[in-house]
Amino acid sequence: MHRSKLFFTVFLFFLPNFALSEVKQANSVGTSPIPWLSGVINGSYERRINPEIGLGLNGFTWNYVSSDWKFSIFGIGPHGRFYFEEENNGLFVGGSISLMSYSWSGLGLSGSGSIMSLGGEGGYQWKWVNFYNEVTLGLAMAGNIETPDGTSANVGSAIGGIGYKLGWYF
């Protein structure tokens, strides 16, 4: 019990110093909190390979269950960004590729499959010491829904939207 109190006290003492350090950060983690309201859990990791270019990985998952319907989807994919300003602050443009796997069941039927999408985005990132906020405008094109039995449905339509992300550089 005393060890856990000591650890917690040390953690609280050193966390502000670690989180507010002015060291040049090459890594970041972030999330879009607004989709959490509908149960979508998402996150991203990005590493700066030079001051203007970042490469990373995005992922999300969502599960919906009701009395007669169940749906689950998981997506992951790489992304790249070009920042017009150095120090992780300002305008950026980027692109991504995602692979999404889904399954559903309901009304006596079930299915599963995968979807590939290609997307682009532009936005602005505000940095405060190690923390950041960003607003993005994005567009994605989804391919066909492929199922194991060989059937497919074309969902090749554009999906666009405005996004908000917050995160932490380390």
Language model: regions and residue ranges:
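Gram-negative (and chloroplast) outer-membrane scaffold detector with strong preference
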Residues: 44-137, 168
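Transmembrane beta-barrel domains of Gram-negative outer membranes and organellar outer membranes
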Residues: 30, 37, 140-142
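Extracytoplasmic loops and strand-loop junctions of Gram-negative outer membrane beta-barrel proteins
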Residues: 26-28, 104-106, 146-149
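Residues that define the transmembrane beta-barrel architecture of outer-membrane proteins
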Residues: 25-27, 37-39, 70-76, 89, ...
